[in-house]
């Protein structure tokens, strides 16, 4: 009996220690189901951003659902439809069947910004930590109950200490918010042009690792603006496709091009390869390490792009894993 009691006590202590040390802000425990319907975003601009950077992010988000006949192809919305197609494979499969047909149709995920808040003075400091990261998520949520908080960090904020600049400058995760029963899903991205452009601003800046390849001019004219879009697109795609489901989907498949990301997580049982992360640094067909793949260059501005959005704007967006073809889907 004494031995059993000691064992039970030891187990309890282990659990308590685990709970105390487990980071809340960067938890990778996934949500229970794929979001569908409307994805309401609440943006927190933390630090100082240029007008171009803010406009670029808003224009990209608005372009996700812009699939009108007018405008040039390929469109950003075609990329977002690949994200939406993940719903055909899982829980919603039997719900969205076309009338008089057995063919399933993925419901649209409408994305819109419902709140935009600016903190240029950086209330919680210029260095991101586990503690103030959680506070930033709370600030982005405000008093809204059904939004996805998106925290955008300016180039003045140092985020390397929480895992940014290590192959990526974004993450989507769950944060436990004070006063709420369920943890909240959120996205956090940073402008890498000062802290680590070689990690997160390629192909607009020379890569720090691997083949350097060719660099291009950003379509907006600002490296920070277009790098933010790439990071935000990655976070949105990975969040909207539900990591819990994609983990099993990719279990027996190889990960193209992102060996560095995989090596950094080899010791973690929680490592999840998300759809956009799986195709990191792939922007067009025929891509290989150091080469973006097939993209276009605007003959007037010299800006690189692979898709079009609202008002004929040009964007360079990351490739995304297509579960139907089991390959990286690219606009070109």
From Swiss-Prot:
Q: Where in the cell is it found?
A: Secreted; Secreted, Extracellular space; Secreted, Extracellular space, Apoplast
Q: Which sites carry carbohydrate?
A: 36, 102, 143
This entry carries the following GO cellular component terms, namely: apoplast
In the UniProt record, the signal sequence range is: 1-27
Does the keyword field hold Transmembrane helix? no
Q: What InterPro entries does the record tag this protein with?
A: EXORDIUM-like
Name the keywords, alphabetized.
Apoplast, Glycoprotein, Secreted, Signal
Q: Does the keyword Glycoprotein belong to this entry?
A: yes
Described by its record, this protein's role is as follows: May play a role in a brassinosteroid-dependent regulation of growth and development.
Family membership, please give it: Belongs to the EXORDIUM family.
UniProt protein name: Protein EXORDIUM-like 6
């Amino acid at each position: 009996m004494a031995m059993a009691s000691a064992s039970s006590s030891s187990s309890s202590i282990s659990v308590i220690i685990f709970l105390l040390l487990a980071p809340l802000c960067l938890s990778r425990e996934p949500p229970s189901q794929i979001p569908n319907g409307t994805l309401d975003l609440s943006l927190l601009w933390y630090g100082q951003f240029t007008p171009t950077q803010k406009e670029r992010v808003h224009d990209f988000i608005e372009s996700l659902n812009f699939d009108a006949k007018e405008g040039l192809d390929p469109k950003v919305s075609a990329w977002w439809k690949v994200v939406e197609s993940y719903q055909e494979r899982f829980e919603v499969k039997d719900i969205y069947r076309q009338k008089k047909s057995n063919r399933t149709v993925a419901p649209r995920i409408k994305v819109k910004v419902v709140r935009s808040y600016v903190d240029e003075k950086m209330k919680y400091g210029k260095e991101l930590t586990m503690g103030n990261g959680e506070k930033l998520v709370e600030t982005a949520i405000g008093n809204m109950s059904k939004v996805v908080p998106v925290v955008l960090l300016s180039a003045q904020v140092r985020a390397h200490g929480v895992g940014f600049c290590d192959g990526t400058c974004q993450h989507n995760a769950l944060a436990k918010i004070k006063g709420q029963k369920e943890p909240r899903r959120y996205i956090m991205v940073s402008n890498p042009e000062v802290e680590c452009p070689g990690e997160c601003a390629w192909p607009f800046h020379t890569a720090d690792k691997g083949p350097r390849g060719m660099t291009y001019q950003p379509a907006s004219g600002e490296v920070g603006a277009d790098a933010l879009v790439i990071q935000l697109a990655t976070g949105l795609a990975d969040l909207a496709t539900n990591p819990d489901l994609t983990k099993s989907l990719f279990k027996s498949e190889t990960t193209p091009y992102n060996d560095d990301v995989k090596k950094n997580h080899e010791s973690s049982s929680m490592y999840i390869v998300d759809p956009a992360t799986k195709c990191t640094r792939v922007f067009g067909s025929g891509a290989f390490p150091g080469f973006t793949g097939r993209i276009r260059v605007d003959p007037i501005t010299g800006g690189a792009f692979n898709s079009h959005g609202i008002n004929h704007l040009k964007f360079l967006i990351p490739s995304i894993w297509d579960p139907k073809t089991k390959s990286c889907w690219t606009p070109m």
